[in-house]
Amino acid sequence: MYIGIDDTDSREKYCTTYVGTLIVEELLKLGYILEEPRLIRMNPMVKYKTRGNGGVCLKIVGKIGAEDTKKNNSNKNNSNNGTPKNIEYDYKQALEDFNRGNIDYEALSKESNCKSSLKSHIKSLKSLKSYRTTLNPEITEESYKLSKSEYLEVKTIVSSIVEKYTDFDCSTTNPGIVLINSRLTRQKKAILKNYYNSVLTEIVSLDEAEAIIKKVGAEYIKYKKGLGIIGSLGAISSYFSENQTYTYELLAYRENDKWGTERYVIDSSVVEMDKMTYPYTFNNVDNNKNIIAPNTKCPVLYGIRGVSKEILFNAKEIVESENIDKYMIYRTNQGTDHHLRIMNIADARENTGAILSGYISEEFTEITGGHVLIELTDSTGSINCIAYEPTKKFRHIIRELAIGDLITVYGTIREEPYQLNIEKINVVKLNNLYEKVKKCECGGTLKSKGVSSGYKCNKCGKRLKYDEIPKIQIVRNLREGFYEVPPSARRHLSMPLSLINYLPNNLR
């Protein structure tokens, strides 16, 4: 069974990942077995998104004692909720065990401290050209199909938690739940695969989402406008994408009575964590400033992103903060560039992500507000590309570009004004630039008398034609290679350059 949830939060409170965590907690208590939950980010250009345009998906793959439960459905005294009486299950430990998954924590606990286990794990990561874990294929091919009573039980749990932890007072919060409890044919999987591509690169309408839900035999629950079903189905559809590149995020949640108060996360410990775990964790600090803790009143204390669960567990132990109520590790498409597609400039369209290659065709322009604009041209057309003020020093790179430079830009395209918001660039080839030597052999200065008259020395009076003036090559301050915006200005989906060697990508 697949469960998709989206649009429960607002800029003031709550968080869809917290809702997902509470649901996992309740399902584990009832003996349900789940794969690692997913946090899926979608097209960042959607105007009606609440915060990060991300949906959550949970996948039930079994139930402890399910067969015993079916045999004893008629037994009114059966009160173990599907858990066999001979199985001791520590519900307090359930969420912790779920997050740990199949990690050998007995071995890790024998290490002298978290730093030594971290060094051991980093050593193993360094030996890999590309880090990518795989789930057990025996349980990922098909999800567990619930009985009618189990389905109603799960549906009730999901809807009640969504209803309790949604900011219904916010006009832009429109929750939606999608449930799939049927075997999916190859045709239905193909439909979901295409839908995943759509929610990443297009603006999907509510009608389109409802039509797809009907085609694949799913059920949905809409609250208010119900726009959340678009992202809920999008999160589910990630299972059927050909691109299974992923990262992880450990989300630590605050104790309820601290929601809305100032967060206590020691910045120096975050900087230390980043130094110890980089590049296997990412987007932790910007200019030595902690950026893992949000500024909203939501339940999240902080979120650490990385390439493996093990790295995140160790990173969590290094960060010093207020008490953590609970935490969850989500498998995500963050930092994967899933929202970008390689295309010609003529094929680029508004509200989508693009990878465009071409030549700089005009000098940069400074725009009010501190933004910097350049024009990129290929054989099919031209487009303006912008580095906004929050990208700070990255704008210096854009200013160093010159007419004739061959570059590739990565980013999303605005509707109005029509331009590409730069996330990173690859300077493929720098154009050779020259300047005229304005000094005469006698040491005097050559003054221009117009294109037709050439130059005249102000000291000896010697005249030179325009094309007789010697040229020297200008030494460029810019070097060929990749450049990216700082972490604080980076989109959730944008791949940091630090991950090039660890995730399959379009950058290599």
From Swiss-Prot:
This is tRNA(Ile2) 2-agmatinylcytidine synthetase TiaS. GO terms for molecular function: ATP binding; ligase activity, forming carbon-nitrogen bonds; nucleic acid binding. InterPro entries: NA-bd_OB_tRNA, TiaS-like_TCKD, TiaS_FLD, tRNA_Ile2__agm2C_synt, Zn_ribbon_TiaS. It is found in: Cytoplasm. The gene is tiaS. Its EC number is 6.3.4.22. It holds the Pfam family TiaS_FLD. It catalyses: cytidine(34) in tRNA(Ile2) + agmatine + ATP + H2O = 2-agmatinylcytidine(34) in tRNA(Ile2) + AMP + 2 phosphate + 2 H(+). It comes from Methanococcus voltae (strain ATCC BAA-1334 / A3). ATP-dependent agmatine transferase that catalyzes the formation of 2-agmatinylcytidine (agm2C) at the wobble position (C34) of tRNA(Ile2), converting the codon specificity from AUG to AUA.
